[in-house]
Amino acid sequence: MLDQKELLCLLQLASPILPVGAYSYSEGLETLVEKGIISNSASLNDWLERSLCQGSIRLETAVLLRVYRCFCQEDFTKLNYWDNWLSATRETAELRQQSWQMGRSLLNLLRELAPARDNLPEQANYATAFAIGASHWQIGEELAVLGYLHSWASNLINAGLRLIPLGQTLGQSLLIGLQPSLLTATADIISLADENLSSWSWGLSFASMNHETQYSRLFRS
């Protein structure tokens, strides 16, 4: 049975009101909408489904899992290795800065909420900071992975609501429809070996590169 305190901690860590600035990023979605590649709920759903199956979010969350285990074991050398490894996979300045800014904000929050912790890094990627928070609050690794993926999907759907635009009810329908894919991605990530860490996300990379010079922008990525 799911522990109630564990559930509450997960809900807080994955909350859309977590003060990390997630709402200001679209991860290339703004460019894809401007170019007509994503124009309705079906094309947005297809983008999210494909990302969960083979995109960078899958790789990012797999690193989160490894950082989680390192923090539980207090293996900070290996934790830093995986955090640096994740930074190296960010293919544009926008995506790297997004990850660093959100990670820094979450670490600052964790210092306020858990002042007894004296082993938090000064800077880390968002996935790293999320893993540290999940470990500190004793959220199980599978729930941490699922919560991170759900938070990511919620944020991009919210961006889609404003960009396409879509109605709120349709956005909620999209999120419910993603549940099987979120569960499948979680199971796949849990079983992924180090030598199989990879992603197929050139579409995201090109969208992000184009976004850096886009004339009119609502989002920072």
Curated annotation (Swiss-Prot):
Which InterPro entries does this UniProt record tie to the protein?
UreF, UreF_sf
The answer, when asked if Cytoplasm is one of the entry's keywords, is yes
Q: Where in the cell is it found?
A: Cytoplasm
Gene Ontology MF annotations: nickel cation binding
Look up the domain of life of the source.
Bacteria
The record's Gene Ontology cellular component field reads:
cytoplasm
- First-listed, main subcellular location of the protein, grouped into a coarse class: cytoplasm
Q: What keywords is this UniProt entry annotated with?
A: Chaperone, Cytoplasm, Nickel insertion
Q: Which PANTHER family match?
A: UREASE ACCESSORY PROTEIN F
Q: What's the subunit arrangement here? A: UreD, UreF and UreG form a complex that acts as a GTP-hydrolysis-dependent molecular chaperone, activating the urease apoprotein by helping to assemble the nickel containing metallocenter of UreC. The UreE protein probably delivers the nickel.
Function according to Swiss-Prot or TrEMBL: Required for maturation of urease via the functional incorporation of the urease nickel metallocenter.
Family from the record = Belongs to the UreF family.
Protein name from the UniProt record: Urease accessory protein UreF
Q: Which organism is it from?
A: Microcystis aeruginosa (strain NIES-843 / IAM M-2473)
Traced from the root, the source organism's taxonomic lineage reads: Bacteria, Bacillati, Cyanobacteriota, Cyanophyceae, Oscillatoriophycideae
Query: Its encoding gene is what?
Result: ureF
